[in-house]
């Protein structure tokens, strides 16, 4: 996206002074895949591909989103059944069970931890910090759950935001991949 080719021409969306940032969908897909049990080495290769090929000023401003208005909610992706092209009627009737949600919240906290510590900046889609779930539009765009927020998740996001604010290597530091194998993802900032 920093120097994208589309419609037969090189586009300079970010480095051409048109946009301040771009959506970092590689990050989203890699992190959610890892949280669903994906291979850590593969996930880190996806992340490293961006780190090695994007200029540092671009890396610093990549939008690290786990959910957007164009995607399923992260909690649903991590803990729910895969969408697999199912229709809107199926999506409308899906809700995580208590056990799915409990496991999903734990995995979402892991994903959010990576969202706040990988290169780029955390871009939280409204309601993710409160535990909203949902498949594709319009199910990912429900109202914010005022008074029913997952307070543990909100406190987790706040703590990570404060950590990032107080620790400059998290927003301007180097990145060292120390992932040892396919089961563990690790890096140093």
Regions found by a protein language model. Give the residues of each.
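Short Gly/Pro-enriched turn/cap motifs at secondary-structure boundaries
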Residues: 103-104, 115, 176-177
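Short amphipathic alpha-helical surface micro-motifs
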Residues: 3-7, 43-48, 105-107, 125-128, ...
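Glycan-recognition and catalytic regions of carbohydrate-active enzymes
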Residues: 124-126, 130-189
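Short, surface-exposed beta-strand/loop micro-motifs that present aromatic residues
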Residues: 51-54, 112-114, 182-189
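Short secondary-structure junctions and interdomain/linker hinges
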Residues: 54-58, 72-73, 118-122, 164-171
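Active-site-proximal helices and loops of the catalytic beta/alpha 8
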Residues: 1-62, 114, 133-162
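Aromatic/acidic polysaccharide-binding cleft in carbohydrate-active enzymes
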Residues: 11-14, 64-96, 112-151
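Aromatic-anchored helix/helix-loop segment that forms the rim or "lid"
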Residues: 41-44, 48-50, 84-109, 162
């Amino acid at each position: 996206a920093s120097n994208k080719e589309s419609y037969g021409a090189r586009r300079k969306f970010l480095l051409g002074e048109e946009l301040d940032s771009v959506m970092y969908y590689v990050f989203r897909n890699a992190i959610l895949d890892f949280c669903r049990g994906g291979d850590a080495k593969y996930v880190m290769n996806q992340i490293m591909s961006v780190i090695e090929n994007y200029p540092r000023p671009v890396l610093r401003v990549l939008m690290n989103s786990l959910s957007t208005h164009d995607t399923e909610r992260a909690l649903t992706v991590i803990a729910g059944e895969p969408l697999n092209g199912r229709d809107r009627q199926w999506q409308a009737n899906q809700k995580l069970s208590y056990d799915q949600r409990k496991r999903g919240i734990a995995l979402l906290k892991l994903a959010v931890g990576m969202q706040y510590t990988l290169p780029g900046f955390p871009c939280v889609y409204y309601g993710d910090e409160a535990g909203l779930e949902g498949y594709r539009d319009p199910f990912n765009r429900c109202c914010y759950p005022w008074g029913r927020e997952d307070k543990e998740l909100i406190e987790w996001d706040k703590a990570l935001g404060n950590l990032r604010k107080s620790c400059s290597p998290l927003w301007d530091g180097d990145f060292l991949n120390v992932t040892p194998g396919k089961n563990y993802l690790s890096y140093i900032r």
